[in-house]
Amino acid sequence: MEIETWPIDKVIPYDTNPRVCPEKAVAKVAESLRTYGWRQPIVVDTEGVIIAGHTRRKAAELLGLKTVPVHVAHDMDPDDVRAYRIADNRVAEETRGDKDL
């Protein structure tokens, strides 16, 4: 997977993103970025619109970052992008935390 560094303002939120990013979640992701660094890039289409990673982008903004790591999904057509957005959000909905960890 090729990862590029982009100015944060070139990474465009998807205007009909189905997932709401609560401030609490953004703060937790920001803390994770501060502690562990970037372990997952933001995935964008060839126009720079976010496919996956809205919360990571908001966390980067909260931290005042000027650049973010990005993977451009050159191999995905619009139907693939739509399907991936849906799948990525559904997987998150189907998971839960293990309080014993």
Language-model region placement:
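Short, charged/polar connector segments at secondary-structure boundaries
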Residues: 1-101
